[in-house]
Swiss-Prot record:
Annotated function: Involved in peptide bond synthesis. Stimulates efficient translation and peptide-bond synthesis on native or reconstituted 70S ribosomes in vitro. Probably functions indirectly by altering the affinity of the ribosome for aminoacyl-tRNA, thus increasing their reactivity as acceptors for peptidyl transferase.
Principal cellular location given in the protein's record: cytoplasm
Name of the protein: Elongation factor P
GO molecular function, one term: translation elongation factor activity
Keyword annotations of the record: Cytoplasm, Elongation factor, Protein biosynthesis
Tree of life domain: Bacteria
Family affiliation: Belongs to the elongation factor P family.
Gene Ontology biological process terms from the UniProt entry: peptide biosynthetic process
Length: 185
């Protein structure tokens, strides 16, 4: 159990049997009565953000969340097939649960998977990945007046905007949160 004094951004709590993540919180004391804590909570299951107010010292539950190291094996229809690195059990995770992160996965890649009551909820990828450009248009000479970009298809199939000097076969660093080009490797 957590007390409201334990609240901080990113803390995961359970309320009415549903796991939430604290997005924002603020302690306040009204003119009359005890102190209160206003929170913005993100429902981990569906992503909705709700406001909730707690009395100071109120207790809330800890969700049954677990983070495990797994290896991405392959796609099967709309599912990702992952293997637990400790038990070697295979786990199926629907692609919609990944918020588009599945586009960064290569066969054999190691990822962290967030589980709630044994069911997969989310993938945790590194902040940046190095991927190879498999398809892009050649840059035009002299077209460097401003910050010009062009689309480039990467080895995992996702398309990102890259500067014109990036060519097919180059290995580039990509931010997995914003899908932005970070530099060449």
């Amino acid at each position: 159990m957590y007390s409201t004094t334990d609240f901080r951004k990113g803390l995961k709590i359970e309320l009415d049997g549903t796991p939430f993540e604290i997005v924002d919180f603020q302690h306040f004391k009204p003119g009359k009565g005890g102190a209160m804590v206003r929170t913005k909570l993100r429902n981990i299951l569906n992503g909705r953000v709700v406001d909730n107010t707690f009395r100071s010292g109120e207790k809330v539950g800890r969700p049954d969340l677990e983070s495990r190291d797994m290896q991405y094996l392959y796609h099967e229809g709309d599912d990702l097939v992952l293997m637990d690195l400790t038990t070697y059990e295979q786990l199926y995770m629907h692609e919609d649960l990944t918020d588009g992160k599945a586009g960064f996965l290569k066969d054999g890649q190691q990822v962290r998977v967030l589980l709630y009551n044994g069911k997969p909820l989310d993938l945790e990828l590194p902040v940046s990945l190095v991927l190879e450009v498999v398809e892009t248009e050649p840059g035009a000479k002299g077209d460097t007046v401003s910050n010009v970009t062009k689309p480039a298809k990467l080895e995992t199939g996702i398309v990102v905007q890259v500067p014109i000097f990036v060519n097919q076969g180059d290995r580039i660093k990509v931010d997995t949160r914003s899908r932005e080009y970070l530099g060449r490797e």
